[in-house]
Amino acid sequence: MFIMKRYLATLCLATTCTIVLAQSRSELMSREKIQKNKIASVSQWTHKFNKDKVDPKGYVTVVTNYDKNGNEVEIINYKQNGSVSSRHTYKYDNQNRKIEYLQYQDYRQKGIELAFRQVFTYDKNGNKASELGFDGRTTYRIAYSYFPNGKQKEIIRYNAANQVEEKWIYEHNGNNTKISIFKPVGTLSKITERKYDSAGNLLDEKNTSGDGKELARTVFTYNANNLPISKSEYYAGELRASYSYVYDGQNQLIETYLIKPNNTRLLYSSYKYDGQGNIVEEKWYEDNATDYSHRNYKLDSKGIVDEVDTYYSDYNFRVVYRYEYKF
């Protein structure tokens, strides 16, 4: 198992992000484990603390339903009063590729309404070919094209009037890739340059503005097992932070250190595992917090998570998540 948070940047042309104080499926169990154990549904109960004691009542905060392949098909988030705050539905093809995502939100005085929609298609090689979407205000379309060798060629975003809003043009030269981003079309707004090693690991990513000024740069190094052992982040040409990663004999990440430009070294996160590779303890540092946040996991004999005792140091908030399963 390899766990790394706050790691690689992802390409986002149209996304929305929500931060919740809860556990995602990927943090609890892999799709393969859900499929193997034939889990059909998981209900997350939230139990707050009353002084130093866990409130035994609790309330349901998330219900996640799965298909027979272990894919999430529905996630319902609940408010403390039991009403629905949001609903997310997913559809997949026979290769477990996501083909539709719908997000419904509870808007005050409006009730539950569609807030976000994505529909995906794929080409004969399994590459994403198109995305049709609704971002809460208007519709959009994203078209993806590829070179004969399968490498990305272009990504083009169209607005509701079918006008080009944004274009990403890829140039590949050996292990190097250059991405020219035009937004609006005709105006070069950013250039991203990536360098990879022979194993396909990202070594260097540099972002510059259209007029050539360096915006940000990230540099990685790897061990013999192709696991990252360091990451250095630069902004406007200056080193802002470095991270080093430590693994155990099973290639499981056990520690992440933050090294500041003044060479101050801080334990940024740590992980402990049981004999089957299941994570049982996680600690991480929040900026300006006086203590580490943590999660302690209780598992059953099959490695399925029963309970997570969680403390968020930046909020000084402790909570226990308990899980009920339907098979």
Residue ranges and their predicted role:
Residues 1-26:
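Bacterial Sec-dependent N-terminal signal peptides
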Residues 23-327:
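Buried hydrophobic residues that stabilize the cores of well-folded domains
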